[in-house]
Amino acid sequence: PIQCIVTCRGINSPLSIQPDTIEISYLMQTGMLVWHAETAQDFYDWILMGYMVSEEPEVHLPLALCCDGFFVTHTKDVVDLTPTDMCLPPYDPYRSPVPCMDMECPPVRMMRDPFIMKSNYISYATHASWQQEVWAAAERSRKHTIAWLNGLIETEDVDADVLIVTSGTAVSQGREAIRLLADEGIRVGLVKIKTLRPWPEEEIKEATKHATHIIVPEFNVI
């Protein structure tokens, strides 16, 4: 499975390097796994973790690792590198849920009409059911994602009456807002969403069950 690195920047005129997460919305219903990094460290670490999850035989889906424009793409930061002797395990295509195609001797379909019609029907039925399998695979990725990312969400002070719930670098700005509000005596909690697919619905419900006000900041100028 491929991994797409998505740097979310303004797609409307004029050209901009500022963050705009509308690009992520185009990926939400494609069947891809979608993760949203807050920092350069997240971005670096999750590339390797993404391969570990997406290459699981029961998952085997492409993954979109998203980060926000400017704050991650156009700034400098210090990250902890993985040890030089740490490598991804070799990918074994024969563990894939989809049979490998031998490009040296590819299969060719040469049949008369009745057989072709039957074959095309089988292809249609396969693709019609495959959509359900893709979404099921995304759900099966949940346990692997939780293990590698240490949960689908990250929380701070969720017993506060006011919570900021967001993803990406809006989390960093949320942390700054929480610091400023604390100086004024206002206590605010934080829920950082790490993955959009799979969507951590139950985790968010549990984290926000005591909140009376929920604020959801995002970078979307359209």
For each feature predicted by the language model, list its residue ranges.
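A short secondary-structure junction signal
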Residues: 45-48, 75-78, 175-177
